[in-house]
Amino acid sequence: MSGLVMPEPDAAVLQRRAGIVADLRNIVPGEGVVDTVNAMRVFESDGLTAHRSLPLVVVLPETVDQVSDVLRYCHDNGIRVVPRGAGTSLSGGSMPLADAVLLGMSRFNRILEIDYPNRVAVVQPGVTNLGITKAVEHEGFYYAPDPSSQIACSIGGNVAENAGGVHCLKYGLTANNVLGIEMVLITGEVLRLGGKHLDSEGYDLLGLMTGSEGLLGVVTEITVRILQKPETARAVMVGFPSSEQAGQCVADIIGAGIIPGGMEMMDRPAIRAAEDFVRVGYPLDVEALLIVELDGPPIEVDHLIGAVESIALKNGSTTCILSQSEEQRLAFWAGRKAAFPAVGRISPDYLCMDGTIPRKELPRVLSGMRELSEKYGLRVANVFHAGDGNLHPLILYDANIPGELEAAEDFGADILRLCVKVGGVLTGEHGVGIEKRDLMPEMFNEIDLDQQMRVKCAFDAKHLLNPGKVFPQLRRCAELGRMHVHRGELAFPDLPRF
């Protein structure tokens, strides 16, 4: 697994597998327990397909009581648990472990309530992101966060990763659009955080859960904000001779006080791949392409379009195409949202990175990526949530060529180090998972990481939920002064602790 270190499987748990499977069948009867090798292969990886592992067993509960009972059983018996939504994580956040129960939430797929007067929907975590919008669009509403995988990704996974999308610049990430959740702790306890009402007292545990990557609990119900569709939405497609000019245009648009509904950028390799795949009319004679969407009352949109076009011209734009219909606006976005599968047509494999930088540093980072591309001898196609500086470099490689996966991972790590160096962060919306786990010390010092681990320990003292993710290895509750001695034996007795 290209040098990736994961927790050692618990031999005692592996030996008890048959009994564990039988016990879980008593909790989740029928077809809710999957334990054959062939059937479990469906779950051996998520969107980060470079790393694969079969779970101990797969459990697919249908009720909150079943989730609670499974987690309580695992807690009482010292069995690790890996929660899984739709399996679209690009950071390996739901990669299974050989000694862990994979808890799949796909059967929690119902929309429980739509409350138009309060502009909220109550949904189960297995509902797809796009499914929420589909359920309310006939009344003129929609759910704002829209990651490229919205047709497949689940709202539960969106909460775990704090997903964004092309419209998060104006309408926020998942954290800004989730009002409440029901969750189950590893001990089996069920609690509610937030809801339809204003909830400002006490600690912001709802905010803590959003983006916690399955380390603190399992979400079983989510209350989300739904918005009315804007009166008008139009998109401007602007081409530039260089990525640096496009990046400066982005900074100038925001600097002018304009907050577009969405603002995305692609470089030449991504433009060509998307156009060959979707055929929406992207210009192929430019080095960088901006898609800027303005929404609101028609008179305001017209004014903002003029302002954006003027800023683009000042930055040397060579192409400017304004959508003339809703179909054309959607077509502009279709190419951008298809960028990932489009790149998959021109390369056997690719890694999708997810760093975030200050907007003003975009030209510097793009220049650095070109140098890294030459250093590693690997191509890179770039797509960005340009408005908030969230980069998605796609590193193209061939896993069949010895050493290319490792080179791609090293290339990606250097990109993320560059992001941190210029004042950015390791992830914007894909999460840390296993992909960025060992880069956490690039951004956080020992005290930072220890305090984060203390929060983890408050929810999960035995470190059973999604182990091996987010935190660098050998960072456990025991190192923070909390030790768990089981049957008179200290776990990992050979590990220096003091």
Language-model features: where?
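Noncatalytic alpha-helical scaffold of FAD-dependent oxidoreductases
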Residues: M1-F498
